[in-house]
UniProtKB/Swiss-Prot annotation:
Pfam families recorded: PEPCK_ATP (PF01293)
EC identifiers of the protein: 4.1.1.49
GO biological process: gluconeogenesis
Listed PANTHER family: PHOSPHOENOLPYRUVATE CARBOXYKINASE (ATP), PHOSPHOENOLPYRUVATE CARBOXYKINASE ATP
Binding site for ATP: 250-257
A molecular function GO annotation: phosphoenolpyruvate carboxykinase (ATP) activity
Quaternary structure and interacting proteins, as annotated: Homotetramer.
Enzyme class (EC, first level): lyase
Protein's organism: Saccharomyces cerevisiae (strain ATCC 204508 / S288c)
Presence of the UniProt keyword Nucleotide-binding in the record: yes
Name of the featured protein: Phosphoenolpyruvate carboxykinase (ATP)
Length: 549
C-alpha cells in the first residue's frame, strides 16, 4: 500500500470525523483525525513522542508523565436531575456543578483543537449484546488510543460501519491541566462524569487507567439502575471440563489478573464483570496487568502477552537491547501492560458464560499477616467481608502509595462505585442464594508476621494450589478449625500447601500470644469501619463480623 493510500484510509474524512471536526472546530489543514487506527499506525505516531520506544518483545513502551496511578480524590460526578438521587455522594463521588462541567469540557475542547493529531476509538463495553454500550474515546496521544483499543471490545468492520451515535463519550485532554481556581476543583487534575450528557472529561493526568476506570464507574451506574444487572470489580474464569464459573473479587494488586489467568481454565476476564439473569459477562476487551516483578516462570501467560500491539506503561528498559527490567520500580511500583484479551491463549471468546458462578473468591492482600491463606465463608460472612472490602492498598496503584497500607474498600471496588454499597451487596446476596454459590476468603498477602515485622508474601504456587483444591472440590471436604475472633473456618490440610502455613495463629513468628494481639488490632479496624454500614445491615450480617471474648 502506498503512503498516500495508507493516509487516505487511516485519516479520511468520514461522517464521524467530520462531526468531531465541527464539534471541536478543527482545521482540515492542521489536524489529522485517525479513527480506529490499527496498532502499526498508532506505533508510528506514538514513537514520535518523547521517550516512547518499542520493547524487545514488540510492545509499545509509553510514559504517563507525573501521574503514574489513579487520582481518586480528583474524581467528580456532575450533580444533575437525572442521576443525583441514585448516586452515593461523599468522598468517593464528589459532586461538581453543571457550570463547572461546562467550563472544564470547553477547556478540554480548547486543548484538543490545538493538536495536530486527534484519535477516535469507537468500541463497546460489555460482551453481552443485550447490555453492551457503545463508547467513543477522543484523545490526543497515540498511546491512549492504543490503550483503549486494547481495553474496549473492538468492533468488526461491519459494526464499525454501522456504529452510529455513541452511548457514552470520553474526552481525554489529560496533557492539559484543569484550572485550580474553578469551583469544585481540588487540584489541576479532574476526572468528571456527566450521566445526563453521557460524557466524561479528563484534564491534568495522562495516566491511561483513568479512562478504563471511568467507563467502569459508568457501568456501575447504568447496569444496576437501568437493567437490574450487578456490576462487579472481579475477574472470572470457567472450567474447561464442566463449565463451572469462578468470580475473584479484589482490589488492584490482590491477584485478580494473575490468578484468573489459569492455563487449566478459560479466562472470561481479569477485572470488570457483570452478573445478569443469564450469567456472567466481561465488560472489557483486554487486560491491564501489573508488571512489577513479572517473570515468565511465575506468570507465563501474562509475560507472553507482552508483544506487538500491547502497551507497556512506565517501565524501565535496557537502552541497548530494549529488554524490560520488570523488577525496576524506580518510576513507579504500578508498572502495567494493556493487551487484548485474545493474547491470552486460554481466553474465552466471546467473553461471557451462560452459567452462574459456582465459587466466589474474596481476595485480600493482608499486610498485617493475621488472615489465613484460605478460609471458607458462611453466607453472612460473605456479606460482611464484601461490604467491608478489606485489603492493603498496594504500592503504586494510587498516587503517593509506596508501601502497603491497610484499607477498606466496600465491594472490593469503592473508588469505582456509583451507588451505595448496600445496593450492590444486596444484589450479590440474592444471586448467591439463587444459584447456591460457595465462597472463600483468600489472603494473597503476608504470612507468619506482618509486612513491617518481616513476614513473607504467600507464595503464588500455594495460592494456585488452594484454588485447584477449590475447583476440584477437595477443599470442601477437608476438616476445618475455627480461627479466633474472626471465627473463620480454616482447613487443616490443603493439597500442595504446607500445613504449617494454613493457620496464622499457629505459625506466627512471635508466638500465638503475640498473634492474638495482632488479630485483635485488625478486628478493631473492621468493627470501626463497619459502623458506617451497621444501620442498614441485618443482625445476621453484623454477627458475622469479629467477636471479642
Amino acid at each position: 500500500m502506498s503512503p498516500s493510500k495508507m493516509n487516505a484510509t487511516v485519516g479520511s474524512t468520514s461522517e464521524v470525523e467530520q462531526k468531531i471536526r465541527q464539534e471541536l472546530a478543527l482545521s482540515d489543514e492542521v489536524t489529522t483525525i485517525r479513527r480506529n487506527a490499527p496498532a502499526a499506525v498508532l506505533y508510528e505516531d506514538g514513537l514520535k513522542e518523547n521517550k516512547t520506544v518499542i520493547s524487545s518483545s514488540g510492545a509499545l513502551i509509553a510514559y504517563s508523565g507525573v501521574k503514574t496511578g489513579r487520582s481518586p480524590k480528583d474524581k467528580r460526578i456532575v450533580e444533575e436531575p437525572t442521576s443525583k438521587d441514585e448516586i452515593w455522594w461523599g468522598p468517593v463521588n464528589k459532586p461538581c456543578s453543571e457550570r463547572t462541567w461546562s467550563i472544564n469540557r470547553e477547556r478540554a475542547a480548547d486543548y484538543l483543537r490545538t493538536r495536530d493529531h486527534i484519535y477516535i476509538v469507537d468500541a463497546f463495553a460489555g460482551w453481552d449484546p443485550k447490555y453492551r454500550i457503545k463508547v467513543r474515546v477522543v484523545c490526543a496521544r497515540a498511546y491512549h488510543a492504543l490503550f483503549m483499543t486494547n481495553m474496549l471490545i473492538r468492533p468488526t468492520e461491519e459494526e464499525l460501519a454501522h456504529f452510529g451515535e455513541p452511548d457514552f463519550t470520553v474526552w481525554n485532554a489529560g496533557q492539559f491541566p484543569a484550572n485550580l481556581h474553578t469551583q469544585d476543583m481540588s487540584s489541576k487534575s479532574t476526572i468528571e462524569i456527566n450521566f445526563k450528557a453521557m460524557e466524561m472529561i479528563i484534564l491534568g493526568t495522562e495516566y491511561a487507567g483513568e479512562m478504563k476506570k471511568g467507563i467502569f464507574t459508568v457501568m456501575f451506574y447504568l447496569m444496576p439502575v437501568h437493567h437490574n444487572v450487578l456490576t462487579l470489580h472481579s475477574s472470572a474464569n470457567q472450567g474447561i471440563q464442566n463449565g463451572d464459573v469462578t468470580l475473584f473479587f479484589g482490589l488492584s494488586g490482590t491477584g485478580k489478573t494473575t490468578l484468573s489467568a489459569d492455563p487449566h481454565r478459560l479466562l472470561i476476564g481479569d477485572d470488570e464483570h457483570c452478573w445478569s439473569d443469564h450469567g456472567v459477562f466481561n465488560i472489557e476487551g483486554g487486560c491491564y496487568a501489573k508488571c512489577i516483578n513479572l517473570s515468565a516462570e511465575k506468570e507465563p501467560e501474562i509475560f507472553d502477552a507482552i508483544k506487538f500491539g500491547s502497551v507497556l506503561e512506565n517501565v524501565i528498559y535496557d537502552e541497548k537491547s530494549h529488554v524490560v527490567d520488570y523488577d525496576d520500580s524506580s518510576i513507579t511500583e504500578n508498572t502495567r501492560c494493556a493487551y487484548p484479551i485474545d493474547y491470552i491463549p486460554s481466553a474465552k471468546i466471546p467473553c461471557l458464560a451462560d452459567s452462574h458462578p459456582k465459587n466466589i473468591i474474596l481476595l485480600t492482600c493482608d499486610a498485617s499477616g493475621v488472615l489465613p491463606p484460605v478460609s471458607k465463608l458462611t453466607p453472612e460472612q460473605v456479606m460482611y467481608h464484601f461490604i467491608s472490602g478489606y485489603t492493603s492498598k498496594m504500592a503504586g496503584t494510587e498516587q503517593g502509595v509506596t508501601e502497603p497500607e491497610p484499607t477498606f474498600s466496600s465491594c472490593f471496588g469503592q473508588p469505582f462505585l456509583a451507588l451505595h454499597p448496600i445496593r450492590y451487596a444486596t444484589m450479590l446476596a440474592t444471586k448467591m442464594s439463587q444459584h447456591k454459590a460457595n465462597a472463600y476468603l483468600i489472603n494473597t498477602g503476608w504470612t507468619g508476621s506482618s509486612y513491617v515485622s518481616g513476614g513473607k508474601r504467600c507464595p503464588l504456587k500455594y495460592t494456585r494450589a488452594i484454588l485447584d483444591s477449590i475447583h476440584d472440590g477437595s477443599l470442601a471436604n477437608e476438616t476445618y478449625e475455627t480461627l479466633p475472633i474472626f471465627n473463620l473456618q480454616v482447613p487443616t490440610k490443603v493439597n500442595g500447601v504446607p500445613a504449617e502455613l494454613l493457620n496464622p495463629a499457629k505459625n506466627w513468628s512471635q508466638g500465638e500470644s503475640k498473634y492474638r494481639g495482632a488479630v485483635t488490632n485488625l478486628a478493631n479496624l473492621f468493627v470501626q469501619n463497619f459502623k458506617i454500614y451497621q444501620d442498614r445491615a441485618t443482625p445476621d450480617v453484623l454477627a458475622a463480623g469479629p467477636q471479642f471474648e
